[in-house]
Amino acid sequence: MADEEIKPTSSIEAGGGQNNEHEHGMTSLPNLPSTREETPRELSPVAGSSRAQSTGEQGVKPLKRFDTLPTRRSQLSPDTRRRGRTLTGQVPQDNDLSSRRQVFRRGTSVLSGESGDRMRSIPERGPVPPTTERESRPSGVSDRTQASGLRPRRSTTSRQRGPSIRRRPTVALEAVTSGADVGGGDNFTLAGPAPIETSAQNQPYVDPGYAHLNPAYVQPENVRPVWGLAKPLPRVVRPGMIPSRTEINMAQQQQQQQQQQPQNQADVDLEQGRIEPTLKLSRISTALQNARQQRENNLMEAHGLVSPTNLQTTASRQEPLTAPSQVIEEEDLADKPTNTDTTSPERPPTRPPLSFDGRPSQTSQNSQNEPFPALSDHDDQESVATEVAGPDDLDGEWIGQEIPLVAYDPNYDDEIHNLHTHWSVIRLRFREPLAELLAVTCQLTLGFCADLVVVTSGKNASPAGNEATTDWAWGLASMLGIYIAGGISGAHLNPAISIMLWIYRGFPLRKVPMYVLAQILGAFIAALISFGLYQTNIVEYGGTDLKTSDTMGAFITYPRYPWINASTSFFTEFVGTAILAVAVLALGDDMNAPPGAGMSAFILGLVITVLSMAFGYNTGAALNPSRDLGPRLALAALGYGKDLFTDVYWIWGNWCAPILGAIFGAFLYDAAIFAGGESPVNYPRKRIKRAGHKWRKKWGVRLRKMKPAKKGEDEAYRRWKESQ
């Protein structure tokens, strides 16, 4: 019996059905002879079990099923989920699993490549079940929304109701970084929306004719540099990064000597990080000089000032530079309107080649008749475009005029503006000071009012807040100020930050006085507004004599307690502002870990909050010279007395300490982390001296021009200008 093969037979012959369980290879008992008369009857429309069908054929009346009982489905029905082990599907071969496909939210396709039909399961045994109406129907949600007028749901994929035997892909796809699932599986993440989707959602509606009437709205981003706290700081070329003619001449002579005496491999691979571990700085000084000369020679070669044949000395110098600190590649020179050839927009054809001594050749000087791009004479530290060679400008050593490195003209020639009224012209001229004024006024008004609320409610049974309340108020107020003016003036809100950015990031020196004046004026206005709003509370709290009202601490900062000496007060402001400067430079460094769009202001608001909590107990944590001087002037005008300026703490405590602290904090960050060439920390020592000498000479010329001219000097100056 064990070796006998049992053939599957059907227990339903009259109905023409087949028992699929026997076809699946399931063993069955041999058919026993039935003593009852078999009466053929129609199959029940309900897909019942084979037992019910067999009993019906044998003449037994089937049991009546009540409506409360669940409908019994056959396990062989295509609508019944199979128990036990199931087949897993295979991903189509033409499925694109690349990261780009997944970033653009295109899920795994379940359609065949040729016909486009839905991929059916591969049967284990038996024929392929036909496609049911339930499977072919996409979803009932879209049908209802079309009829009812509701907005269709686009965030989730239409999912079938009930069981299904359609095969599922087994390849693990990358999780989509958004809650909106378009064609993929159920991917849940806490990382927020994808950048592409976020940028699309933040785009507002724009009428078709709006761009024609307001062309400034559609101009490219980063048309002008903005040294601010709302986004990464700009990368500019500063005078210390550009070689002089003498340095070019010496570099060419050294290159010829190095061709005859090749250097050690350790020196060649210096910038690749392969440095021999040694404490002898003299062994790498030559490599440092060669690496710097190579970068400068690449600059000269790019602008046609040096022949490329003189630059190929070693194998490493033939490799292109890829360091992010080389900001020459970041300057968009093609957008600068110049009289250049359209075939090579990166350099004008009229640039004279340099001879061996680093100066233009005589033939090139004679043939040089076409005008060069006009370079404005403004701040020495903004960019190389500020440097125009003069008669006393290092004896013609400066080559900045021959290298078009500027991408922004401070005379607003590269921008498109919407000038509709007369005020729009004035606003364009003073847009940065106006933005700084508005931001400081809003920031300090909120801060002063929060302090007044806590001070004047101190005698009440339930005071309205405490010191922690004011700390959070100052942090959120600073965040608001950065959001207001971050894209226009940069929202420095602090003279110490403006001076620090001038020294270490090339912020124009000519803009520093305007920024400081706007910040002091904004603090003055904010103090007047706050006093006007809480005047009755101040009188109720301290009386009509403002000198003894004990509300001065809500406006200005000073040592809060008698045991806090001068050194403690000074270094409290010094350390607090140094940490603030480190945070500003870290958030503005695009090579470090800059936050996302719009997050810099929020993070700096939190930084101000924690600084107020940490350093506010000793002195009130001014961290800002204008935040103290503006209210002092306002309180003196309101009648708080002239004793506000008798104590010199407001000079060395609120001005010297924050400015020196910001400079020191920026030095620490650049010495430890920053690698850009615009920082003086990364200048060679000779370049620092040369830049200082050049800066003193230029400002000496400007001061001499401000003096009344003597007789005969005006004509000589006019002739010199015409010769240029």
Swiss-Prot record:
One Pfam family of this chain: MIP
Q: What molecular functions are annotated in GO for this chain?
A: glycerol channel activity; water channel activity
Q: Which organism is it from?
A: Botryotinia fuckeliana (strain B05.10) (Noble rot fungus)
**Swiss-Prot/TrEMBL keywords:** Glycoprotein, Membrane, Repeat, Transmembrane, Transmembrane helix, Transport
Q: Which residues form a coiled coil?
A: none
Q: Where is the composition biased (Polar residues)?
A: 87-96, 307-325, 360-370
Q: What is this protein called?
A: Aquaglyceroporin-4
Low complexity composition bias: residue spans: 252-265
- Name the InterPro entries for this protein: Aquaporin-like, MIP, MIP/Aquaporin
Q: What induces it?
A: Expression is higher in vegetative hyphae than in conidia and infection structures.
Question: What is the organism lineage in this UniProt record?
Answer: Eukaryota, Fungi, Dikarya, Ascomycota, Pezizomycotina
Mapped to this chain, the residue ranges on the Extracellular side of the membrane are 456-472, 535-567, 617-647
State the span of motif (NPA 2).
624-626
